[in-house]
Regions:
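Boundary-proximal intrinsically disordered activation/regulatory segments immediately upstream
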Residues: 1-68
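Short, glycine/polar-rich helix-capping loops at beta-to-alpha or helix-loop-helix junctions
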Residues: 66-70, 191-194
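Glycine/small-residue-rich loop that forms an oxyanion/phosphate-binding "nest" at active or ligand-binding sites
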Residues: 75-101, 106
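Short, structured interface segments
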Residues: 105-115
Length: 194
């Protein structure tokens, strides 16, 4: 899909990036219609690797050439009729639209992934631990690179309750990954991790 240059911020297609509240994006009543916003090429890359469903993209002109590869990947992952709309707005307008400088150049609106059941999550954790253990046993993986291998029969799960600051939730997720935590559960009293 070609890039769509916009001069007016009144375009309703930009609502998802600026005029919808977190609660409206999250859409608790109809979670399958929920949306979350991903910022930066690096985070978009990780989200696409995780299988998210892209809906639309917003960037400023100076990022168009630098992000062609990630835009192509997002377009390839988009299942929306008509493809992935990629909106380009002047930097000052992007700042006015979002309320902050789009310092990482690119925003991607994505469909919220369906959360696994507790049983499915634990089965996935167990399968990943077993696969890592088998790879170490076969000499395909260095034990030092595996992380939480000290006891494959135990699961290490972090539970976040009542964390209301997005920065803290992000820091906890990064720390959990660094410590080899197998899964992170977030209660409804936490702010949205996405």
């Amino acid at each position: 899909m070609p890039y769509i240059e916009l001069e007016s911020l009144d375009d309703v297609r930009l609502d998802v990036f600026a005029r919808l509240t977190e609660a409206q994006l999250r859409n608790k009543l109809e979670p399958e219609k929920g949306i979350f916003i991903v910022e930066s090429e690096k985070v978009i890359d990780r989200a696409l690797l995780g299988g998210v469903q892209p809906l639309s993209m917003l960037m400023t002109p100076e990022w168009v050439d630098r992000t062609r590869e990630i835009v192509a990947r997002a377009e390839a992952a988009c299942e929306e009729p008509g493809g992935l709309p990629v909106f380009v707005v002047p930097s000052k307008e992007a700042e006015r639209l979002t309320g902050f400088a789009v310092t990482r150049g690119i925003l991607l609106a994505c469909r919220r992934p369906q959360l696994p059941s507790m049983e499915d999550l634990l089965a996935r954790v167990d399968a990943e631990k077993a696969a890592r253990a088998a790879a170490v046993a076969a000499g395909e993986l260095d034990p030092g690179e595996v992380g939480n291998m000290h006891d494959a029969s135990r699961r290490r799960i972090a539970v976040l309750e009542g964390i209301v600051d997005h920065t803290n939730v992000g820091a906890i997720f990064r720390s959990a990954a660094a410590m080899g935590i197998d899964a992170v559960l977030v209660t409804p009293t936490c702010c949205d991790p996405l």
